[in-house]
């Protein structure tokens, strides 16, 4: 009788800890916003940042926007969100 109760207690403890960790990691979502009026997007300026894995997704997002002739508006790695601007590159 002792063994099943200890096992269930540990199971509840582990499941509550994992839910707390999942909630904390989702709070740390970062959205990178780019404004073409203040500084136009330059892919060479991100070369230093590409060593961080999360920026790589936004770099690909920016290249996709540039292929369409648009500026990048927002990029979020966690949500896999990539939005291009409405206005064309001049």
Curated annotation (Swiss-Prot):
The record's account of tissue expression is: Expressed in the pistil. Detected exclusively in the synergid cells.
Where is region (PRK6 binding) located?
67-87
- Please name the CDD domains in this protein's record: DEFL_AtLURE1-like
Compartment(s) of residence: Secreted
Enumerate the InterPro entries for this protein: DEFL_AtLURE1-like
**Residues annotated as glycosylated:** 23
Q: Which domain of life is it from?
A: Eukaryota
Listed GO CC annotations: extracellular region
Q: Which UniProt keywords apply?
A: Disulfide bond, Glycoprotein, Secreted, Signal
Where does the signal peptide begin and end? 1-19
| Function summary | Pollen tube attractants guiding pollen tubes to the ovular micropyle.
UniProt lists the family membership as follows: Belongs to the DEFL family.
Listed under subunit, the entry gives:
Binds to PRK6 LRRs.
Protein name per its UniProtKB record: Protein LURE 1.4
Q: Which organism is it from?
A: Arabidopsis thaliana (Mouse-ear cress)
């Amino acid at each position: 009788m002792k063994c099943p109760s200890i096992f269930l207690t540990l199971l509840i403890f582990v499941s509550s800890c994992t839910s707390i960790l999942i909630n904390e990691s989702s709070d740390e979502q970062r959205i990178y916003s780019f404004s073409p009026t203040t500084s136009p997007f330059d892919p060479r300026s991100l070369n230093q940042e590409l060593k961080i894995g999360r920026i790589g997704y936004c770099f690909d997002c920016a290249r996709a926007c540039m292929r369409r002739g648009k500026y990048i508006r927002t990029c979020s790695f966690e949500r896999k969100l990539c939005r291009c601007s409405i206005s064309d590159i001049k």
